[in-house]
Amino acid sequence: MNKLLKLSLSTACIFAACGDSDKDSGVAGGSVEDGEIIAEEIVTIENKTISGVSQKGPFVEGASVTVQELEGKTLAQTGRSYEGKIKGDRGEFSVDVINLESQFALLKANGFYLNEVTGKESESQVTLYAFTDLSNRSQVNVNLLTHLEHERSLYLLKNNDLTVKKAKEQAENEILASFGIQGDFGSSEDMNIFGTGDGSAALLAISTLMQSDLKEGAFSKRLADYASDIEADGVWDNEKVQTAIADWAAKTSLKGGLASIRKNIEDWELSDKVPAFEKYVNSFWWENYKLGTCTTKREGEVKKNGNSSSALKDMEFICLDGAWLEATDFSKDTHSWKAGKEGESRYGDSVTTNCYVFEEGAWRDANDSDCSLELDGCTEAKEGTVGKGSDKSWYICRDNSWEEASTMEKDTYGWKDAAEGDIKKGDVTDTVYVFNGKK
């Protein structure tokens, strides 16, 4: 027989230490005892196989996955559980459940995992949880989102007139929003870092950001602190940790580290494609630095890091091709330039004393003489050429630099071989030269 489910304050003891009871609030549908709320009907689960994937990066083969029974009235653990093992490289598991007295269960994954930041197996084990309703599903993935949302979900159930589904949806959306991510990605229990959609990209981005360069112990503490922070109000208030993550993300992105993370995942050969997680990682530090989105209208805009607590607080960034990059003199000077002619030289737009030369299809830094002498740039193609500079002196292009030419170099530049003993006056001076054979 179906019966109404009552959830008490003791629910939170599943995941965290219990505190003092809050005042009870009115609930639609009738009065309740102190600390209890009315929820949906209880459904017994019998002879059901629960399968899915367990991922931070993917948990490695041999890691354990446990389906723990929760009592229907309080969501307290009954002590009954069913255990399985990770049996695939992608973190796949399957657990045969004989009987659960309610549809609510807690999945626990524990073991080593592949770290997407290093590309290697973790040195220590970690534990992730997923709180789930099995009444209409047999597929449950355990991942960072399911782990981060479960304490917040339980708080919402205790303090609001919400169904489990609505509580979990709200918790998930709050977590995504704390990382600056908006979107309807479906349930966290259906997300997979090896998918191709935005939900998969968001999950992988959050996994990457929270991992950063931390070892497993510090990583687990960061997860616990985050869950505790958002439990009561759904807001992540720890600006110090947010800034630390943003600094790691900025340094990693600017040095090409996101491409390395992508390659790490590709090298695992567990999926044909890697979701576009980079956009969410970059968006996180852009917003933390108060840069905003780099749009077409903002192309070439230079803006300083707006986070005074950041380790990169003095750095300037420039909006180029949809991304914020470090604003070097070169980028500020040349970002609006089109291709030039081979050897063309010009001074910078921002720092007008900087000289640049167009060589082999691109602008490069150059010596001041490449601009000031008005001889164009001394490029590899011009090696050995001689010309008269704007200062009326003669110069020769040698090793990408204009050097003052010797009397013989400026007098004989361009001469062809002659007959043995031929005499000729220099082109610039009155010096006379005798041809005495090929050199």
Model-found features: residue ranges?
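Sec-dependent signal peptide recognition
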Residues: 2-10
